[in-house]
Regions:
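Generic beta-sheet signal
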Residues: 1-2
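Oxidoreductase cofactor-interface core, primarily capturing Rossmann-like NAD(P)-dependent enzymes
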Residues: 5-198
Length: 198
């Protein structure tokens, strides 16, 4: 089964990322600060309001970082972050992924594995390498510190995530476990769109 990163726990806790306002804030800030991630999200969202929202938020964060902040940019940042931490639009879907995991946990009547991508999952180049972790969201720095999450969320390319899933199908290292895989995505160049517009 494939879920979402929101079902992974924050380090040292039994709090799922989906239930943590500080996760949502770190998630959207990290997404907005990455040109490759913004492009990936725009490809997924299409030409709707969500596409404009992420682009405006990225621009507002850039204005603040570059010392050219305006009241309008501040409004965009504050309203986006308030919405993200109070009731992010993706929360119902991610909560549903967590619920589906709960149907498997403790169930030994069938052989299962449940993989969740790390927070910074996107199209990107194939490296063929990845690392794994069970139950917890992978972070840069001290993996046991769930204090500040901003700038610490790890990721993986869709190619490397697919390799991790295929490897698990063959090796079965994570039977009856919830796990994740992450890899190198340091380049900030958008990958060609994996989506086809009809």
């Amino acid at each position: 089964m494939i879920g979402g990163c929101g079902s992974l726990f924050l380090p040292g806790t039994k709090i799922c990322a989906v239930d943590s306002p500080k996760f949502w804030l770190a998630y959207w800030r990290s997404m907005a600060d990455s040109y490759a991630h913004v492009t990936y999200l725009e490809q997924r969202f299409g030409n709707g309001a969500a596409r404009l929202d992420i682009r405006a938020y990225r621009s507002a964060r850039g204005a603040q970082r570059e010392g050219r902040d305006t009241p309008e940019a501040q409004f965009v940042r504050e309203s986006h972050e308030k919405r993200a931490t109070e009731n992010d639009h993706a929360k119902p879907l991610i909560t549903a992924c967590r619920t589906s995991l709960m149907f498997f946990e403790g169930n030994s009547s069938l052989e299962w594995t449940f993989v969740s991508p790390p927070a910074m999952y996107r199209s990107g180049r194939k490296t063929g390498t990845y690392e794994t972790l069970t139950d917890y969201i992978p972070l840069r720095g001290d993996q046991n510190d769930s204090g500040i999450l901003e700038g610490r969320l790890k990721g993986i390319s869709t190619f490397d995530f697919a390799i991790a899933i295929a490897d698990e199908a063959e090796r079965r290292n994570f039977r009856e476990q919830h796990w994740t895989a992450w890899g190198e995505i340091s380049d900030d160049e958008p990958a060609p769109s994996p989506y086809i517009n009809l």
